[in-house]
Amino acid sequence: MKKLSILMMLCLCVCLGYAQQVTLQEVATGAYRAEGIYGIKPMLDGEHYTQISRDGKKIVKYSFKTGQEVGTVFDVETARDCTLKRFDDYIMSPDETKILIQTETKPIYRRSFTAVYYIFNVRNNTIEPLSDGGPQQVPLFSPDGNQIAFVRDNNIYLVKLLFGNSESQVTKDGKFNHVLNGIPDWVYEEEFGFNRAFDFSADGTMLAYIR
């Protein structure tokens, strides 16, 4: 028993001798922070993902299996009638036939921002503004991809893509710091960690929102 105890103590001493010393500086600067992959969006087929190119001009398609580029979904230089030089982000429609291209992003609070969005038709390679009425917030495709709801100046708007992108105003009483439709105020955004307060029903016929 005495020999076993001595052996265990020797092993412990050896392990401690090789142990890595962690400094406060390393912890404070994130030296041991877990690495991650950011900015990738999986596609419906489960085999590919998309990502913005380094120059901010393309949405590039990659293979999960190989990690290699396999195609380009959107390119500001080849899309028809596109005047954009670059873009900030994008939102795919549920069926991936349309993409909302986000430009001119301006922060409001930590998670909220306004931006100018464009609708890109993947099949036709065409692009057009989501709205001509000014920057938008938190645009959302309906489940069938035929409608887009968004907030502007504290009111909710609806764009129907099957009817010539006709735009209608859903709420009309929005007022800065008084009445907010479809978006949280600063406190709720901070405490609950969200920036959109509306959603479509599963069949896309109704819109629920917080006021």
Show the residue positions of the predicted features.
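Beta-propeller folds
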Residues: M8, A19-R211
